[in-house]
């Protein structure tokens, strides 16, 4: 029996939809986009390269508040300022560098590398310096960010102006806003010199230190590096320490004078790229090899804690110092810091270590929480950076939501890179990001690739706006906080990984660096609210033309599916084909398909 379905109801109205006649499938020329990146450090330089390399019809500008590139590695010039990750693991994958002068580099070495990258790829053409973002507001009607900027040219009054963009990339990082100690009298009572390690003055060097009584506040990485640099030269050094420190060894780095690469080694790396890659991979294997030690009660955690406690005791001979510096928390709760020179410096005759907080400053010195005043000429604040993740300027998203308010108590991001209510916005090194395990370079590349995928999707599908859903973001952060309970970061310690008032861990990704890279390899678009520039979201299909169709004639390969790469060797052998010939033809300019079976049966 045949059943006929009869449409009931009014006849459909004539569609008001009109297909865009000149739209071509997947053609970037369909839509020009403007991108603003904030900051020209490692992340901003990376995005300048990625957009130049992978995109078309994109207008990209990088605004940098400083006078040049480099971010942290431009501004941090305190004595011995450097990176505790091996040089060859601290490079872009597209720009492995044979000429690193030493195994662990100083800030000036790293800046020189970044300068060479920008020169090689002409990336400064996208950058505007001495230009600071002071406000960013999302315009829902236009589907764009309006960005207010302040430019400070030398010898001129500051100039404010507006710009706009479809995508806003925040590459400010977490080490860009120095944090001063909240110490009464530090700035308004003390008559001596006050210095922050993140803004070390050019006129304070060995000559000025020679007879100074110097106080250092803090026991993090900048303190550990700076103390070792100034101790041999100052008249006297007072160091104020509130918490124990894990003096670790990171991929062979003890903080002591590092291996210098010979000219012969550098020449080999230049002439043999495979040797350079092999050396870099061997370092990465070491850098990422400690992941298991961060889980509570694991054998790796217990073994690492015992080893480094014993190692510290063998170097620090003074019982009081050894007891004060030995942590009461697990290995890795605070960032592991190579510090052999520091451990030797604190035992010298011109050094006093005070295991007390700083209570206040007098005109002539520092009063500790123990009530004792120490007379000093200079105070060095090695107090790190504001790590609350709150932006330094207003970022106003949908419905007037200010990211500074949204993140006032608990900074929560989607996969460490996006935020609900902040459309078309990606941040680098956001909350819950793999800052704790190995070099940041591979995860940074993954975030840049993630941003490129969204940028291309906006172009190809004429997307107006996208932002992660609040509910899915909440569930992700619920997972993060539950995961933390199983790790060393749940221990009681003061760390920039945490909100030290509440104890909440804000910085850590719930897994290894490799885990993060795998998770964000492809965006989960189902986690996003997406709106389109056209009323009909299928308008980007156009009149059915592809770029190959438009090219036509002999210029177009209208059968790209027919190629050697798609022939499975198993099939070819089963029908009597010569697999060796197939492989040789592929090797002339092709590779075997990733999904091809390699069985020879």
Curated annotation (Swiss-Prot):
Its cofactor is FAD. Keywords: FAD, Flavoprotein, Monooxygenase, Oxidoreductase. The record marks 335 as: Transition state stabilizer. Its EC number is 1.14.13.-. The keyword Oxidoreductase applies. Pfam families: FMO-like (PF00743). Disruption phenotype: Impairs the production of sterigmatocystin and leads to the accumulation of averufin. InterPro entries: FAD-bind_Monooxygenase_sf (IPR051209), FAD/NAD-bd_sf (IPR036188), Flavin_mOase-like (IPR020946). One of its GO terms (biological process) is sterigmatocystin biosynthetic process. It comes from the Eukaryota. Pathway: Mycotoxin biosynthesis; sterigmatocystin biosynthesis. GO terms for molecular function: flavin adenine dinucleotide binding; monooxygenase activity; N,N-dimethylaniline monooxygenase activity; NADP binding. It is an enzyme of class 1 (oxidoreductase). Induction: The genes forming the sterigmatocystin biosynthesis cluster are co-regulated and induced on oatmeal porridge or the fungal isolates were grown either on oatmeal porridge or in YEC medium (0.2% yeast extract, 5.0% corn steep liquor). Expression is positively regulated by the cluster-specific transcription factor aflR that binds the palindromic sequence 5'-TCG(N5)CGA-3'found in the promoter. FAD binds at residues 42-43, 64, 73, 84, 90, 133. Belongs to the FAD-binding monooxygenase family. FAD-binding monooxygenase; part of the gene cluster that mediates the biosynthesis of sterigmatocystin (ST), a polyketide-derived furanocoumarin which is part of the most toxic and carcinogenic compounds among the known mycotoxins. The first step in the biosynthesis of sterigmatocystin is the production of hexanoate by the fatty acid synthase (FAS) units stcJ and stcK. The polyketide backbone is assembled by the non-reducing polyketide synthase stcA by condensation of the starter hexanoyl-CoA and 7 malonyl-CoA extender units followed by cyclization and release of norsolorinic acid. This is FAD-binding monooxygenase stcW.
């Amino acid at each position: 029996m045949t059943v006929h379905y009869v449409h009931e109801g009014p006849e459909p109205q004539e569609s008001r939809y009109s297909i865009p006649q000149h739209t071509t499938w997947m053609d970037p020329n369909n839509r020009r986009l403007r991108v603003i990146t904030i900051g020209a450090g490692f992340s901003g330089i990376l995005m300048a390269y990625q957009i130049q390399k992978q995109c078309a019809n994109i207008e990209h500008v990088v605004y940098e508040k400083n006078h040049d590139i480099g971010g942290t590695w431009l501004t941090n010039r305190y004595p011995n300022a450097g990176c505790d990750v091996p040089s060859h693991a601290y490079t872009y994958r597209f720009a492995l560098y044979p000429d690193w002068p030493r195994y662990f580099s100083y800030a000036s070495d790293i800046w020189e590398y970044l300068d060479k990258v920008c020169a090689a790829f002409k990336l400064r053409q996208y950058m505007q310096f001495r230009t600071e973002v002071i406000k960013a507001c999302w315009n829902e009607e236009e589907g764009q960010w309006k960005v207010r900027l302040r430019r400070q040219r030398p010898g001129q009054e500051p100039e404010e102006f507006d710009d706009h963009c479809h995508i806003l990339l925040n590459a400010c990082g977490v080490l860009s806003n120095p944090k001063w100690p909240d110490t009464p009298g530090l700035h308004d009572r003390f008559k001596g010199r006050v210095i922050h390690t993140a803004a070390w003055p050019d006129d304070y060097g060995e000559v000025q230190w020679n007879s100074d009584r110097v106080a250092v506040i803090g026991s993090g990485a900048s303190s550990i590096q700076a103390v070792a640099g100034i101790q041999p030269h100052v008249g006297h050094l007072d160091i104020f320490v509130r918490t124990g420190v894990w003096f670790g060894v990171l991929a062979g780095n003890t903080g002591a004078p590092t291996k210098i690469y010979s000219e012969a080694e550098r020449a080999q790396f230049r002439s043999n790229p495979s040797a350079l890659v092999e050396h870099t991979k061997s370092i990465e294997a070491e850098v990422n090899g400690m992941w298991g030690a961060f889980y509570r009660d694991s054998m790796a955690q217990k073994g690492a804690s015992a080893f480094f406690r014993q190692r510290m005791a063998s170097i620090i001979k003074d019982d009081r110092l050894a007891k004060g510096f030995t942590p009461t928390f697990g290995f890795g709760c605070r960032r592991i810091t190579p510090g052999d020179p520091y451990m030797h410096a604190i035992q010298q005759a011109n050094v006093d270590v005070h295991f007390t907080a700083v209570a206040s400053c007098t005109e002539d010195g520092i009063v500790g929480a123990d009530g004792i005043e120490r007379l000093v000429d200079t105070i060095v604040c090695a107090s790190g950076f504001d790590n609350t993740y709150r932006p330094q300027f207003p970022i106003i998203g949908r419905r007037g939501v200010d990211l500074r308010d949204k993140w006032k108590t608990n900074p929560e991001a989607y996969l460490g890179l996006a935020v609900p209510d902040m459309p078309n916005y990606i941040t680098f090194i956001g909350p819950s990001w793999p800052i704790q395990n190995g070099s940041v370079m591979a995860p940074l590349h993954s975030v840049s690739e993630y941003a490129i995928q969204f940028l291309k999707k906006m172009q190809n599908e004429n997307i107006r706006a996208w932002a992660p859903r609040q509910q899915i973001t909440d569930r992700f952060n619920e997972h993060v906080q539950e995961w933390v309970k199983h790790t060393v970061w749940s221990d009681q310690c003061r760390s920039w990984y945490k909100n030290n008032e509440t104890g909440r861990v804000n910085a850590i990704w719930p897994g290894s660096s490799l885990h993060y890279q795998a998770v964000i390899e492809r965006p989960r678009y189902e986690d996003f609210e997406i709106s389109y520039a056209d009323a009909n979201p299928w308008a980007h299909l156009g009149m059915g033309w592809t770029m190959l169709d438009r090219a036509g004639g002999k210029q177009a390969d209208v059968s790209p599916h027919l190629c050697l790469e798609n022939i499975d060797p198993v099939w070819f052998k089963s029908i009597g084909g010569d697999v060796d010939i197939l492989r040789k033809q592929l090797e002339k300019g092709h590779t075997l398909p990733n999904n091809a079976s390699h069985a020879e049966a």
